[in-house]
Amino acid sequence: MLTLARQQQRQNIRWLLCLSVLMLLALLLSLCAGEQWISPGDWFTPRGELFVWQIRLPRTLAVLLVGAALAISGAVMQALFENPLAEPGLLGVSNGAGVGLIAAVLLGQGQLPNWALGLCAIAGALIITLILLRFARRHLSTSRLLLAGVALGIICSALMTWAIYFSTSVDLRQLMYWMMGGFGGVDWRQSWLMLALIPVLLWICCQSRPMNMLALGEISARQLGLPMWFWRNVLVAATGWMVGVSVALAGAIGFIGLVIPHILRLCGLTDHRVLLPGCALAGASALLLADIVARLALAAAELPIGVVTATLGAPVFIWLLLKAGR
């Protein structure tokens, strides 16, 4: 038994090391790649200072943090709701952030600065989160709380559809670009949004013990003495914050929160002491690679990153499911 535990521990360490190397390689490639390839030796030239440090670095950091936040949010949702199909958009938080952003675009007639749009997206996500916490205080079961989140998401989706239908052509272009996701407008002015993600990410990565108990199921977690009401509220609030900030930075990006935790579990990373940091590393790496593809796929335009993540990731996910089912 001890030998098996040591083997599993060594395997977990190897996985984390491999994911760390992958993330570093993706980060370096993201800084080098673009319309002009700039190798690390040219980063401190005048051209490198402009393209790498002023344009590519803030975008790369935003992609890294958003990928980590979405993947960790997916892992938290899947443990909390005991559902492998749970993901950040399931509770309606992503759509809530979208409603806040769309309201800001329409009411501000496209004239609001980026920081104001970001605050409105966060406010929309937090409003949905507060509604969910109100349901949670009524001691609803996990399944009913999940259904409440799905219903809120449907309502927010309907509101976004109505807003797009009545918007002008200029607003519609901006809204459609947001709904497909993208990091094209990210620069150092959004650094406050990036900083807002870091403490919550670090805190959740340190909560492996309650997450492992939640993964056993609600009944087992209660029997082990876990205060379900407290942890449900805290985790829903933390997820709402991360998703709201991510939407404010990049718009709606699917797939990462659903598939990354599931893929890592299929690879044997079930302990949240390893799964949570693994999700952060894998989510950051996957979104960095998707962002590179989005930038380089077309010569004169940039693909929406949400389309890239779904196109590249869905076949891999299906292959892993078929492989695990053999």
UniProtKB/Swiss-Prot annotation:
Pfam families from the UniProt entry: FecCD
InterPro entries, sorted: ABC_BtuC-like, ABC_transptr_BtuC, ABC_transptr_permease_BtuC
Protein keywords: Cell inner membrane, Cell membrane, Membrane, Transmembrane, Transmembrane helix, Transport
Ranges that cross the membrane: 13-35, 55-77, 90-107, 111-133, 146-168, 188-205, 242-264, 274-296, 303-322
Membrane topology reported for the UniProt record: Multi-pass membrane protein
GO process annotations (BP): cobalamin transport
Cellular localization per UniProt: Cell inner membrane
Family: Belongs to the binding-protein-dependent transport system permease family. FecCD subfamily.
Function in brief: Part of the ABC transporter complex BtuCDF involved in vitamin B12 import. Involved in the translocation of the substrate across the membrane.
HAMAP family: BtuC (MF_01004)
Full protein name: Vitamin B12 import system permease protein BtuC
Protein source organism: Shigella flexneri
Highest classification ranks of the organism: Bacteria, Pseudomonadati, Pseudomonadota, Gammaproteobacteria, Enterobacterales
